[in-house]
Curated annotation (Swiss-Prot):
Entry GO terms, CC: cytoplasm; small ribosomal subunit
Compositionally biased residues, Basic residues: 114-123
Keyword Metal-binding: no
Chain residue ranges for the region called Disordered: 114-136
GO biological process, one term: translation
InterPro entries xref list: Ribosomal_bS16, Ribosomal_bS16_CS, Ribosomal_bS16_dom_sf
SUPFAM superfamilies referenced in this protein's UniProt entry, alphabetically: Ribosomal protein S16 (SSF54565)
Molecular function via GO: structural constituent of ribosome
UniProt record similarity statement: Belongs to the bacterial ribosomal protein bS16 family.
Keywords for the protein's UniProt record, in alphabetical order: Ribonucleoprotein, Ribosomal protein
Source organism of this protein record: Chlorobium chlorochromatii (strain CaD3)
Name of the featured protein: Small ribosomal subunit protein bS16
Length: 136
């Protein structure tokens, strides 16, 4: 069986992964058929690059993505796009839907960042209040 999976590269404690198409019997960092992308988890935000046409080709040929790679493909919106193609939508419809999807993803990311900043601010205020009450 052919799998789309991660191949580790990079140095110690600084991983960089190649997204490769490989036979499921080959070892993690062993022989592979093709490199279809890269994933850098240490960057903020994470960097995911895919050759969308090649991923689509291999999935059409029957390659199964692993759970981690499936979530990375979903994060780029490729699975949503492939689903719409499978349903027979026109290219224009797919393009407008993908623009809406990207806008929703950006809004979700911004909301997450603002919530994180608000929590951090509240934590600092609570620490400052407890420190001032401990002094007095």
């Amino acid at each position: 069986m052919v799998k789309i999976r991660l191949k580790r590269a990079g140095r110690k404690k600084m991983p960089v992964y190649q997204i490769v198409v490989a036979d499921s019997r080959s070892p993690r960092d062993g022989k592979f058929l093709e490199v279809v992308g890269h994933y850098q988890p240490t960057l903020k935000p994470h960097s995911i690059t895919l050759k969308k046409d090649r991923v689509e080709y291999w999935m059409h040929c029957g390659a199964q993505p692993t759970a981690t790679v499936n979530s990375l493909i979903r994060a780029t919106g490729l699975l949503y796009e492939l689903r719409m193609k499978k349903l027979g939508r026109s290219e224009a419809d797919i393009a407008t839907e993908m623009e809406k999807w990207e806008a929703a993803q950006m809004a979700r990311r911004e909301k997450r960042v603002t919530l994180k900043a608000r929590r951090r601010r509240a934590k600092k205020e609570a620490e400052a209040a407890s420190a001032s009450s401990a002094e007095g």
